Each structure stands twice: as C-alpha cells, then as structure tokens.
Amino acid sequence: MNTRVVSFPPPIDRNPYQALLYRHLADQGVEVGSAGRFTVGWLHENRALVTTLHFHWPEYYYRFDRGPHAARGLLSWARLVLFAVRLTVARRLGYRIVWTVHQLSPHESSSRRLDRAGAWLLARSSHVLIALDRSTAGALAAELSGSAARVRVIPHGSYIGVYPRGRPRAEVRSHLGISGDAFVVLSFGQIRKYKQVDVLVEGFRAAHIPQGALLVAGLPLDGEESRHLAEAAGAGREIVTVLEFVPNEGVAELFDASDVAVTTRIDGGTSGAAVLALSLGLPIVAPSLPAYEELTGGGRAGWHFDSGDAGSLAAALRLAAASPAVRAKKARAALERAERLAWPEIAAQTAAALRPA
C-alpha cells in the first residue's frame, strides 16, 4: 500500500522545517496530501485517500485561544474531549498516527495539566512517536508511561543550502550600525517569553566584551519581552534589534555578519535556530542541556553555560570572544555537525515510521 500522509497542522509558511521534510519524503515515495481538517467528518471522507496522520504541534487541536480569557480554560477542556474522540475515531478507522515531538510541552502554557493531558492522549493513540533528540526520547519514556517502545529518535534536518547568502558582511554591519571589528553575538528567532530575553541581555552586559554587540533579530510575539528589548536597545548602542519577520533573503546575511549565535531557551527539545546557526557555519552559545550538548557534539561546535544563569552566560560569551582561532575551529565543527543532519537519511527514517505496518 502506498503511504499517503497529511500533516497536522499543515506546513507553516514562516518555518521551512515541514516543507523540507515533506519534500524529501516525496523522494522516498511518500505521497503528501493537502491540508486536512481533523474532524470526524474529514476522517470518514478521506479514509480511502490517506493512510497516515502526522502530528507536529497537537496544541492546535485542543487549545481554545479566542474570546474572553475567563472562558478559554473551560473551552480548552471541551476541545480536549473532542480531540480524544477524534483520535479514537481515527484509530478505529485504521489510520496510522505518528507524532513528531518537537518538545514534550508547548513553549508557553496557561495550563500544564491541560497540555499534559493532550500529550498523554496523543501519545497513547500514536503508533510511533518521533523524538528529535535523545533527551526528548528519555522525557517521553519517563513522563508518558508505556510509550518507550514506540519512540524513535530521528534528528532535525539541517538548513544547509536553504537560504541565499545575501550581502557582504561589511555591508550588513554598516547597515545595522555595527562596526567592522565588533564581536557580534546573534540571537535569532521569534521573540517569546520562553526565550529568556532578560537572561540574554543581562548575560551579554555582564560579559563586558570590548567592542561587543548583541544583535537580536526576529518577529516579536510577546509584547512584554519586546518592550524589554526595546528598552535595552535604547539604553546603549551595543544592543541592536531587528524586531520583525526576517524574509528568506535576509536570514543568512545576519549569520554571516555575526561571530557566534546564542540561545537561552530552556524548555527542552531541539532548537531550530541552533540547527540553522550550525548549518550556516556559526558556532553556538547554548545552555548545558542534553539536547544542546548532543547538537554541538559535546561543545566541539560551541560553548555551554548553566541554564538560566546570566553570570554563566557572560563567562561563556567571554570565552567565545577570547580567541578567533578557537572560533574558527568551532565554526568548522558547526558545519560538520550540520552536514550529519542530511535530509535524505532523515526522510528515509521518517518514511519508515509513517508507513502502515
């Protein structure tokens, strides 16, 4: 039987991960269907056309994020009941269900109990759970009893060759008001609470790097975090912000204009922004968490600091700034780490997980 898969949610335009995955799955003979609606009616209507339901972020299907805040909790629990019913119908109709677990809990949560229940329901209903790293696989086995035998570790693919290189380094720095001899630390990605912007700014300032510059680029999705960044940028020229969605043609040039990339998120799971940095040959400064240590090869492609500790981050940034020769060595290692995340192999493993037994 041919494998015909539908993604839930459909591929997100502003994140190329899903598009890259399904493009390479097509090369493996997997047919990728158009956007599906996870309803009982859709499940019945498409049973002869679709073999596999592939979930990525299940919170889209049980959270209720509209209307009065006071009613959202109750309505979310009602949606969770519908989610459970639909999963039960999907199993009884014979669909294969696969969940790629980007992180065990959503980035921001108004109810950990709700999100834990949603994860438990989907994990129980899934034939296969795909973890992007070993630490997520371990968390799945520990927190969702009975899931260990169904977990497969298939890493996040690289972004090598996805983004055009863009303008020269000197031109980009000049445009941003950053001097040519500055040591530039890049934080790239959506501005959200779980990214710990306060730790990032405090750690950078505590590092006291001569001619250091912190470049923060990404779409602001959290008003409080964005205001904090704007205030920090207004207090001194060493912090530069590009608080907007960065189009594809502008992504690589920001990394090329920087010396290291930094991430301060501690929610677990594999960071797509960290994979992007490695793919563009930029070493990363990241928390000492198993997923990041796995990604950097135990620090060969970056530096690590104690999670949530601004002082430890400052020390790691000083180390990164201290030696251009060490940075160059780690930059080569970064690209080598990214080259191991080849999409053809990842797609082959994912295709095997998606195929009906």
Range-by-range predicted roles:
Residues 138-142, 158-175:
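Acidic anion/phosphate-binding donor-loop and adjacent secondary structure
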Residues 179-195, 201-204, 215:
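Conserved donor-binding/catalytic core segment of Leloir-type glycosyltransferases
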Residues 188, 213-227, 244:
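Glycosyltransferase donor-sugar binding loop
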Residues 226-252:
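Nucleotide-activated donor-binding/catalytic signature segment of Leloir-type glycosyltransferases, i.e.
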Residues 246-258, 275, 279, 293, ...:
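Short acidic alpha-helix that forms the nucleotide-activated donor recognition element
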Residues 253-269, 282:
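Acidic donor-binding loop of glycosyltransferase active sites
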Residues 298-311, 319-324, 339:
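Conserved acidic donor-binding segment of nucleotide-sugar-dependent glycosyltransferases
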Residues 325-354:
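A charged, aromatic-enriched C-terminal amphipathic alpha-helix characteristic of glycosyltransferases
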